[in-house]
Design a protein with these regions (language model features):
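Conserved Rossmann-like nucleotide-cofactor binding loop
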Residues: 15, 38, 271
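Dinucleotide-binding Rossmann-like beta1-alpha1 core, especially the glycine-rich loop
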Residues: 49-129
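Short, well-ordered coil/turn residues at beta-beta hairpins
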Residues: 63, 144-145, 267-268
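Active-site/ligand-binding neighborhood in enzyme catalytic cores
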Residues: 124-241
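Glycine-rich FAD pyrophosphate-binding loop
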Residues: 24-48
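N-terminal Rossmann-like FAD-binding beta1-loop-alpha1 element of flavoenzymes
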Residues: 5-32
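Conserved flavin/dinucleotide-binding core of flavoenzymes
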Residues: 102-106, 311, 329-449
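Mid-domain catalytic core of redox enzymes
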Residues: 26, 237-347, 354-361, 365, ...
Length: 449
């Protein structure tokens, strides 16, 4: 069967839903094609035995005004939930326990996380010379400007927490452009941060509060609210997009189905593009689709009686130097309401990542053993105590890694969009990996079509 629509969005993850939602609000004729039998992409909320937990992203950051504006538009069907004030605390593992990551000068001086020499070294950061390598990795930049221990016990675990990546491979100007620009534009992290804080802000700018967020009841509520009024075709298998002779686009799926449209927006992972866009020359496709995605195993662990153990923080991160088998542990029940029964606790463990891709092949029993060992040794629960909930989720293509080849990928995307009018290549292969980035990108694309 053949249909005609103005715009087709490929993929019903957060980027695709955000894009289509804004287009629909403009009165545009838009339809989403999704391979899976459900919408939401990596976002999936579960409710089991009094626990509410996520199998994909746990939180986002209100990093753009578009995030706050989206929830305002969805008011009545989805409510923004800002994390508790205690979520500002981040814990870092060193030795045999967690230490709070300092957030002020006094804390930076007194913390046992950093060497004394580096504590003095940071005082000279505003006068340190700029780097000369435009593709300098995050880790090298941090060690050069702040010192080795700041790299090892602040930047390394931060990169593990955000990217599940290797800070010596992630290129700063692509992976952390705001950090890169502080040195590039102001010559210093400290001077740049002070200057940015003094810049005048509009009322709209202030909507980007940088606070951690979820949705009341879980992120699935956001997916449901976005998709409520949209035309979405799920189970769209063997999907292919081809340009037509008359300057339109043909989207075929399930063998006999076809939608012809004027514009098509792809929001799928880079690894799915070769099969989706067979008309793109191999050389150009290789420059886009070679993006590496770090694999992640996420383990949800819940206890109905926390026995008084309390972790009022966002989570605990583990520096690679400490050689633990987990990347970090998030504390969702410390951040948000009604994530566990009264008196209980909910934890989200992250295992694997770019530096331990082999962990994806470990059995459920091996993953369970790793998690329980951390449950007892790191969170200090009694050895005889077992969790009331333990769920394992495996994500082969979890988080894209913005390495030094990213510039070539971005240039290829731009060239292809110029070469093929009406084709928009979106998703997390560009413009950032966080939920805030995905919402921002969706709104930006919708306003540009």
């Amino acid at each position: 069967m053949k249909q005609q629509h103005e715009i087709v969005v490929i993929g019903a993850g957060l980027t695709g839903l955000s894009t289509a939602f804004h287009l629909h609000r403009q009165g545009r004729d838009v339809v989403i094609l999704e391979k899976a039998d459900r919408v939401g992409g990596q976002i999936h909320t579960y409710h089991e035995n009094g626990f509410t937990f996520e199998s994909g992203p746990n939180t986002g950051v209100v990093s753009f005004p578009e995030v706050a504006e989206l929830f305002q538009m969805l008011e009545g069907s989805c409510q923004l939930e800002i994390a508790r004030e205690s979520s500002k605390r981040r814990l870092i593992w060193k030795g045999n326990r967690f230490h709070e990551l300092p957030c002020d000068p006094v804390g930076a001086i007194t913390t046992p996380l950093f060497r004394l020499s580096d504590k003095f070294r940071i005082l000279g950061e505003p006068w340190r010379k700029k780097g000369t390598d435009p593709d300098e990795p995050v880790g090298a930049l941090a060690a050069r400007r702040l010192g080795k221990s700041f790299y090892e016990y602040a930047v390394d675990p931060f990169v593990s927490g955000v990217y599940a990546g290797d800070p010596m491979k992630l290129t700063t100007r692509y992976a952390l452009p705001k950090l890169y620009n502080l040195e590039a534009n102001y010559g210093s992290f400290i001077r740049g941060a002070i200057a940015k804080a003094k810049e005048p802000k509009t009322d709209r700018d202030r909507l980007a509060t940088k606070k951690v967020f979820s949705a009341v009841g879980g992120l699935q509520r956001l997916v449901e609210a976005l998709s409520k009024d949209l035309r979405i075709i799920t189970g769209a298998n063997n999907l292919k997009v081809m340009p037509t002779a008359d300057g339109q686009w043909s989207c075929t799926y399930n063998g006999t189905e076809e939608i012809v449209c004027r514009k098509v927006v792809t929001t799928v992972g880079a690894y799915a593009l070769p099969a989706l866009l067979p008309f793109i020359p191999e050389v150009q496709m290789q420059k886009m689709s070679n993006l590496f995605y770090a694999p992640i195993i996420q383990v949800i662990l819940g206890v109905k009686n926390a026995r008084g153990l309390d972790f009022p923080a966002f989570g605990g991160l583990v520096p690679s130097k400490e050689q633990k088998r987990v990347l970090g542990i998030l504390f969702p029940s410390s951040c948000f309401e009604q994530r566990c029964p009264d008196g209980g606790a909910l934890y989200s463990y992250f295992i694997g990542g770019a530096r331990h891709t082999d962990y994806l092949q470990k059995s459920d029993d091996e993953i369970r053993e790793i998690t329980l060992e951390a449950f007892h040794s790191m969170l200090k629960y009694p050895a005889d105590m077992q969790p009331d909930l333990l769920r394992i989720f495996r994500h082969e293509h979890a988080i894209p890694q913005y390495w030094s080849d990213s510039g070539e990928r971005f240039a290829t995307i731009e060239a292809l969009q110029q070469q093929y009018p009406g084709l928009i290549l979106a998703g997390n292969m560009r413009d950032g990996i966080g939920m805030g980035n995905r919402i921002h990108q969706g709104a930006t694309i919708a306003s540009s079509i």
